[in-house]
Amino acid sequence: MNRKLIFMLLTFLWLMMGCQSREGHFITDEVYRSQVYADLQERESSLEQGDLFSVFNQPMNMEEKEAMSFLYAYMPLGDIADYGGDYFLENVRTSLLARKEMPWGKNIPEMVFRHFVLPIRVNNENLDESRMVFYKELKERVKGLSLHDAVLEVNHWCHEKVIYTPSDARTSSPLASIKTAYGRCGEESTFTVAALRSVGIPARQVYTPRWAHTDDNHAWVEAWVDGKWYFFGACEPEPVLNLGWFNAPASRGMLMHTKVFGKYNGTEEVMMQTPLYTEINIIDNYGETAKVTVTVKDKEGKVVPDARVEFKVYNYAEFYTVANKKSDEKGQTSLTAGKGDMLVW
């Protein structure tokens, strides 16, 4: 009996250790984790001068190390050079704390959290301490709310802090937007995404490069709620999600897109894959769409692989490029877009 009991205890401890080991990983997919480490090593090899990666010498648990590895593997080079490692480690720890303390944290899929909560950068803004500042201010405000209602409440908070005013092309940081109390749509959406991510809510900035019905462009926010992405106007609170002044224009839009740091393997159509980010097409969230396939041939009728194909929308008295593609070995490329007119060049 004693031997049997000891054997059962050892088996239980072994299983518990295995579970803890899996739970300790920030990236549980071994193949993806290996890819992240390989990409990080490649960056380190190309940036040997200085101590840009010295933060990895600090004590970290497995979860923190893997999260930091993901950030450093795919963040812009300027961020690695301009901001210290302690800054990114503090952001990582705050993000993991939010996932632990917020009631919805345990229900957010690993991939969604990795790509739409962990990253600090939203656009081309200066990075700041907003993740830590916003978390301290917002965690009590969303306490006891569902994920759906928390998104609405955070947007109300954003409206209290920032209102719309046109500005220049330089995107202000989230804390700078609070200090000025205004921002254009790209700044309001950057600010709102930062606020949502601070309390562990997956969020992304959405752009239509050019409207189909009028000149100019627009930016807003999508938040992930219980398995689905919902849109809303940044700093423009409404009583429900999927409602904004731009509902009708967006339903006629030709293209909506967002950029996702890292090698993203979601369900959305990939428009462009770079070493650092994945640009995805999310037009299907807004209206009726159709997929067009283009075949590139030379004057002799032969297919042309690796040809650059531009999809353009007429706006501001010009044909503006909203998507760049490359033809495959068959000379073909495709794009899903709203139903309307485009020039393919």
Language-model segments: residues:
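Bacterial Sec-dependent N-terminal signal peptides
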Residues: 1-27
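Hydrophobic/aromatic-rich core segments of domains that either
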Residues: 136, 140-141, 145, 150-156, ...
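A short glycine/serine-rich beta->alpha loop
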Residues: 180
